[in-house]
Amino acid sequence: GCSSSEILGEHIGKGSSPETGVVVAEAILKVLNENGIYLAAQCCEHLNRALVVERAAAEKYMLDEVCVRPMPKAGGSFATAVYDRMSDPVMVEHVKAHAGMDIGCTLIGMHLKDVAVPLRLSVKKIGDALVTAAYTRPKLIGGVRAHYPE
């Protein structure tokens, strides 16, 4: 999730910047594509926090497609830029991601697997936006007698 408004020091959703969305989208897509990692870009609450993903990811993970296209004022500038730059984008309602990054307090937790572990990053802000991240781990089950691999 990414708020271009927050990056620019505005209240989330109040200063959407397509130019900022493009810069962030291109930087993130470059790194993820080089490492074979699929991006799920979260839209704003006007699109119920739907996500932009590559069709290949939607098919691989059996995600249900929804019919909408993000725009800067309905979905957000970042999601719009990602949609415009993916080779075959589709929109989905839900994912259960292994990890996530939140730029500007966009509340990505609903799209992570159940046990999220905070990840401390060296970069705390992008522009004026707070940056938080998490990875996930399997649930520990079994109680006091259970043993877990290291």
Predicted regions located by residue number:
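Long, hydrophobic N-terminal alpha-helical segment
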Residues: G1-Y38
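Short, catalytically relevant binding-site loops at active-site mouths
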Residues: S4-E6, E45-R49
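Short glycine/threonine-rich loop-to-helix capping motif typified by GTGT followed
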Residues: G9-E19, A50-L63, C67
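Generic secondary-structure signature for well-ordered alpha-helical cores
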Residues: L29-I37, Y83-M91, T136
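Short internal beta-strands
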Residues: L39-C43
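N-terminal intrinsically disordered, cationic/polar leader segments
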Residues: E54, P72, G76, S122-I126
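A glycine-rich helix N-cap at a beta->alpha junction
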Residues: Y61-D88
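Glycine-rich, aromatic-bearing surface loops/beta-hairpins
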Residues: D84, M91-E150
